[in-house]
Amino acid sequence: MFAPLLKKLFGSKNEREVKRMLKTVQIVNAFEEQMVALSDEQLRAKTEEFKARIAKGETLDQLLPEAFAVAREAGKRVMGMRHFDVQLIGGMTLHEGQIAEMRTGEGKTLVGTLAVYLNALSGKGVHVVTVNDYLARRDANWMRPLYEFLGLTVGIVTPFQPPEEKRAAYAADITYGTNNEYGFDYLRDNMAFSMDDKFQRELNFAVIDEVDSILIDEARTPLIISGQAEDSSKLYTEINRLIPKLEQHIEEVEGEVTKAGHFTVDEKTRQVELNEAGHQFIEEMLTEVGLLAEGESLYSAHNLGLLTHVYAGLRAHKLFNRNVEYIVSDGQVLLVDEHTGRTMPGRRLSEGLHQAIEAKEGLNIQAESQTLASTTFQNYFRLYNKLSGMTGTADTEAFEFHQIYNLAVMVIPPNKPLARKDFNDLVYLTAEEKYAAIVTDIKACIAENRPVLVGTATIETSEHMSNLLNKEGIEHKVLNAKFHEKEAEIIAQAGRPGALTIATNMAGRGTDILLGGNWEVEVANLEDPTPEQIAQIKADWQKRHQQVIEAGGLHVIASERHESRRIDNQLRGRAGRQGDTGSSRFYLSLEDSLMRIFASDRVKNFMKALGMQSGEAIEHRMVTNAIEKAQRKVEGRNFDIRKQLLEFDDVANEQRKVIYHMRNTLLAAENIGETIADFREEVLNNLISQHIPPQSLPEQWNVAGLESALNTDFAVQLPIQQWLDEDDKLHEDSLREKIMAQLLVAYNEKEDQASAEALRSFEKQILLRVLDDLWKDHLSTMDHLRHGIHLRGYAQKNPKQEYKRESFTLFQELLDSIKRDTIRVLSHVQVRREDPEEEEARLRQDAEELASRMQFEHAPAPGIEQPLLDEEGGGAPVAVASEPVRNDQKLGRNELCWCGSGKKFKHCHGQIN
């Protein structure tokens, strides 16, 4: 009630923040005259001066005004561009670990240089994150002269880069790369067998370009490094033959069955579910082809893998459409990014779904994969000490940014006011009428010599639109996943007078559409341009530029609404950059997927009430409101899915951090002899307790079982029964001591055969291999647990709480297994002397062989296949505080712990549990 009044009196939070930062802008401006007077060498020397001041205790916040003034002056001299005052505000926003929302054409790339330069002075590295390799290379090479002028180094990380190059790129002051490459390198680092094989340093500060695309759109997509599992191609082929025989079950809204079938499809949640008739029918067919034994159920424990194949086949046929979710190119299924329209070469769906699609398309089926390491972008980017981002559209997702990443969104005022006209949506009864209206609008714009950009949601729609225009004889360019190689060239000239470009979603994002075309691209296409040629190209461009402005600027046509308002705003934002004229219009029909699923009934009834005829359109605020309400509903559902994914992955993430910390500690340690000794003691005590229960009578002891177990686990034959017969004074504790002494004798003999140095090295490699193998199996077990945990809801149990409880038990078992299996291998192995260099070379060869078999996948997002989990009956997820990284001197495992508990380090913070 009072909020509008208070906002009027005091301004919004955003306005107050801008006012606060404007005071710092004035200080930066006050430095400008001083910086202009410096020579190039003096300006460059400022970088070393800043580093020295940081070393003496000065903070980055204290350096900010002067450092920004230096970066601004360097920008003028090297790039010919001076940062505007609003761009300085954007730079401060990034430095403070917030998201800067800036409209298209406001110079986000230039804004990033301010915060990147300031934070690179700390010497801890800055990562600039982009959505694709092209933008990473373009931005790095564009800004490299500026950074190098200031005495900083720049690196670029790319897929399939030689290790030495990649290591050098990460060691640079500023590193450019994609979100995928940073995430996969983090996982690779935690699979390395030597500290020298690791790439990344401490994750210090990241600036994410198009932050909404990476942290929101791709948040549901886990990053997975996998290795090949067993070949099941024949099974996929057999299942694929059966799926078309299943029919979809369709009901009207009132629940009346219009078509009885075997499965239902929920387009809202992208789920497919077999009903009772479907289960019976598929079981009969599987029995006929010999895949299921007579009388057996698909839900028997040993048949669950078969059930997974059936569901993978169903999803491949009913939820994944060619030229929408994927394309087929050169005999391969290439996934299409739903948010950018680009293909993702090398990325594969997991859980057998990719193989099912290959079977459906009649392609060669590649072997299944097993997860070796995984994480999500949500958890990876939260590892950075400081995180920030830039985008043209973040305000609609401000709540999610704050909830998940603790990032505030700051709307940066534009340098010039927006001059774009956004017309109301036009809604038609059918898609055919909608496309006819779009063609009419295109013709009108081309007649006025206006450039037009038509945005489509899928490749299929872009090709349909292209066919319609070809029939009309209208010249145009198509930009989708099939023609992505020409992306930069097409986008560069999309602003020419009368140019018509059709693009899927946000293809070309990150490249401005300049009115009149891009004269710099024209110059770049000439082999050795003369000053006269360049001057002529500029003059021609100026004429075209003025011609387009007088015609009304770029006109953006959208063929349908996206699920997210943000994606729609991104498309609109292609027009009206830097105060240019422009316009946008959305054309919709009741047959569009969003309208059909979420907004159809209300709008359809409204249109019927108006007595609309074929070919007529409705243009009303009520319709636009209904559509936006549907979009908010979808956004809310997607946020719930992403939040649920995070809550589940947070459990796995705490385990991941423990395992990776353990692994890094092992890699850094020169001698893990004490750790192995502790393992041996614990494993032995557990083994003895199983056969000689604590405080039990001798009659309850299973001596024969203990002798057998010691032979199996420790490779020693001990006459325990004979000891007991010969010595009446032997009791439980003294027996433990005697057994341990014998084990030490046996192990010391191994050390004598080789050498202490060789055995220590061998212990480390064995522990690393055991840890990696068991962690890989643990990930698989956790996946199975997560996919079935929602069924606990039927037993009135909270699935999330059950998942936490069971995953904790599994993790405890994992840690016990690591200790037990390590000791078992070390006890049985025969050690021989080997040259350390030969051993290291062999291990490196093994690691390279493993790397060659790795696949890098985007898994289908967990949480989509099952309904959202009920929160009732369970509390919020327990936050586990991470321990601070300590850089002080390493403690011996038998020394007192640094925390002051009075315990030995090995029993306190050095304990492996």
UniProtKB/Swiss-Prot annotation:
Q: Name one GO biological process term.
A: protein import
Cofactor(s) needed for function: Zn(2+)
State where Zn(2+) binds: C897, C899, C908, H909
Question: Can you tell me which residues bind ATP?
Answer: Q87, G105, E106, G107, K108, T109, D512
Its record classes its membrane topology as: Peripheral membrane protein
Which InterPro entries does this one have? Helicase_ATP-bd (IPR014001), P-loop_NTPase (IPR027417), SEC_C_motif (IPR004027), SecA (IPR000185), SecA_DEAD (IPR011115), SecA_motor_DEAD (IPR014018), SecA_preprotein_X-link_dom (IPR011130), SecA_SF2_C (IPR044722)
Q: Does the keyword Ligase apply?
A: no
The record's keywords, sorted A to Z, are: ATP-binding, Cell inner membrane, Cell membrane, Cytoplasm, Membrane, Metal-binding, Nucleotide-binding, Protein transport, Translocase, Translocation, Transport, Zinc
Cofactor notes: May bind 1 zinc ion per subunit.
Write down the EC number: 7.4.2.8
Q: Where are the transmembrane segments?
A: none
Which terms does the record give in the GO molecular function aspect? ATP binding; metal ion binding; protein-exporting ATPase activity
Gene Ontology terms: cellular component: cell envelope Sec protein transport complex; cytosol; plasma membrane
Homology family: Belongs to the SecA family.
HAMAP family, sorted: SecA (MF_01382)
Q: Which NCBIfam families match?
A: PRK12904.1, secA
Function according to Swiss-Prot or TrEMBL: Part of the Sec protein translocase complex. Interacts with the SecYEG preprotein conducting channel. Has a central role in coupling the hydrolysis of ATP to the transfer of proteins into and across the cell membrane, serving both as a receptor for the preprotein-SecB complex and as an ATP-driven molecular motor driving the stepwise translocation of polypeptide chains across the membrane.
Q: What name does this protein carry?
A: Protein translocase subunit SecA
